[in-house]
């Protein structure tokens, strides 16, 4: 039995190829059934995200194994083998285990240390467990990868610092306000970055979210998801005084929030502080706002500085995380080898039991026929000894004939002679 990991990701393949190799949730069961129908495949898990498609397999070793699996993948997706082959990576046993642990821990992600991948790996495992896993070693490998990912999160700072603009904006808000559960947040825009910000804020249970956008329809869809109120851009001047935090990201060519607007809001708030995070280019907030007392303005450049600092911290944490993965991989492979030995021990014990039962039955039959008990017992002991030492004796003789001192030493050691 061999463990394999093969696939493509954001580092080896462009998005147009990754799109063609993806497995949709609707066709996953069919794909797994087709994969398990291959004679060499014992069990499998398919991980398919926007940044990677990977097959984790337990297989029987055979000639042209790699060719057969690549051919299946290409045939299933209607791809040219050469197009896929140059982007495909292939890991076996130790390397396959290490790769899965790195993936689950976020060490192989586009954004180093991002936590979402662990949930995606768990879902892939759960989906594939519906009748497609079949192999305890494969299941154990995934369960181990989950515990390793948790250990990496617990023992390192790999996920402690923000490395995306959206996450950095939310982290900044949490640093300035002791608790977000008592603040009102005004989000200006409804694009991808604001969507991510809104979801982050929802996870931290902000008291109230208001979304201001040029088109109500797009903002309403996001508002329905995160439980926010929608207003028009023209309403910002009137509603700004309610906001403790303003995060803005639009495509407007001119600033949306001016110095005078913020001055009026601060006056109405009796100078309670306001945090303004402008992640738009061109800027949505007039730079002069940053000169106002109690108005704390951060631009996208400020966030990028935070991100670069945090990314350096994550890279340092990744070194520690890689050490954890190396250690855990070694321990898992030791367990896997022990499983192989356990099966051999079971087979050897079963074989010995069969010999014992066979010879004991013959001895009992001889006793029932009135044979001499002492002779029968001596005959049983002699035959049992000869049968049990026959195979080791042949191996010792063959090692001696071959002049293989190392094998002879191993055999002597295993028989307790050294």
Swiss-Prot record:
Classification via Gene3D superfamilies: Glutamyl-tRNA reductase, N-terminal domain, NAD(P)-binding Rossmann-like Domain
Enzyme class: oxidoreductase
Swiss-Prot/TrEMBL GO biological process terms: protoporphyrinogen IX biosynthetic process from glutamate
Pathway(s): Porphyrin-containing compound metabolism; protoporphyrin-IX biosynthesis; 5-aminolevulinate from L-glutamyl-tRNA(Glu): step 1/2
Any GO molecular function: NADP binding
Keyword Cell inner membrane: no
E.C. code: 1.2.1.70
Protein name in UniProt: Glutamyl-tRNA reductase
Species annotation: Klebsiella pneumoniae (strain 342)
């Amino acid at each position: 039995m061999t463990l394999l990991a093969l696939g493509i990701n954001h580092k080896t393949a462009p998005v147009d190829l990754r799109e063609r190799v993806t497995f949709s949730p609707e066709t996953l069961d069919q794909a797994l059934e087709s994969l398990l129908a291959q004679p060499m495949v014992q069990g499998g898990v398919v991980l398919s995200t926007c940044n990677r498609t990977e097959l984790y397999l337990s297989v029987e070793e055979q000639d042209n194994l790699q060719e057969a699996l690549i051919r299946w993948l290409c045939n299933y997706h209607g791809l040219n083998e050469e197009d896929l082959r140059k982007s495909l990576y292939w890991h076996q046993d130790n390397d396959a285990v290490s790769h899965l642990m790195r993936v689950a821990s976020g060490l192989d992600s586009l954004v180093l240390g991002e936590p979402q991948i662990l949930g995606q790996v768990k879902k892939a495992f759960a989906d594939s467990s519906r009748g497609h896993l079949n192999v305890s070693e494969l299941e154990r490998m995934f369960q181990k990868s989950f515990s390793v990912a948790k250990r990496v999160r617990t023992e390192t700072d790999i996920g402690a610092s923000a490395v995306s603009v959206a996450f950095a904006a939310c982290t900044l808000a949490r640093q300035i306000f002791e608790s977000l559960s008592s603040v009102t947040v005004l989000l200006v825009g409804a694009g991808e970055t604001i969507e991510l910000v809104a979801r982050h804020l929802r996870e931290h249970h902000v008291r109230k979210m208001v979304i201001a956008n040029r088109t109500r329809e797009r903002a309403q869809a996001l508002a329905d998801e995160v439980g926010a109120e929608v207003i028009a851009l023209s309403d910002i001047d009137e509603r700004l005084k309610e906001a403790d935090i303003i995060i803005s990201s639009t495509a407007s060519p001119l600033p949306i929030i001016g110095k005078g607007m913020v001055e009026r809001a601060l006056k109405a708030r009796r100078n309670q502080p306001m945090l303004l995070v402008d992640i738009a280019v061109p800027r949505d907030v007039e730079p002069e706002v940053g000169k106002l007392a109690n108005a704390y303005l951060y631009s996208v450049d400020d966030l990028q500085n935070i991100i670069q600092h945090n990314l350096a911290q994550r890279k340092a944490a990744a070194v520690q995380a890689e050490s954890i993965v190396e250690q855990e991989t070694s321990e898992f492979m030791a367990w896997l080898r022990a499983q192989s030995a356990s099966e051999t021990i079971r087979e050897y014990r079963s074989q010995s039991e069969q010999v014992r039962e066979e010879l004991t039955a013959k001895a009992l039959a001889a006793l029932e026929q009135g044979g001499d008990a002492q002779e029968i017992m001596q005959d049983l002991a002699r035959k049992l000894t000869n049968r049990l030492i026959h195979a080791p004796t042949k191996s010792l003789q063959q090692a001696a004939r071959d002049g293989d001192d190392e094998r002879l030493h191993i055999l002597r050691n295993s028989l307790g002679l050294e």
